[in-house]
């Protein structure tokens, strides 16, 4: 299950919440720009 974040009110959304409205809109404020939240990953770089 992917997590999304609204570009205006910054509330986190699930896939199920996005499917409730037609199109891609925030169910809270109606804003149409949604960002996908990625898990924080750590990249280990070997020192020279």
Swiss-Prot record:
Its cofactor is Zn(2+). It is found in: Cytoplasm. GO terms for cellular component: cytoplasm; DNA-directed RNA polymerase complex. Its EC number is 2.7.7.6. SMART domains: RPOLCX. Part of the 13-subunit RNA polymerase. Belongs to the archaeal Rpo12/eukaryotic RPC10 RNA polymerase subunit family. This is DNA-directed RNA polymerase subunit Rpo12. It comes from Sulfolobus acidocaldarius (strain ATCC 33909 / DSM 639 / JCM 8929 / NBRC 15157 / NCIMB 11770).
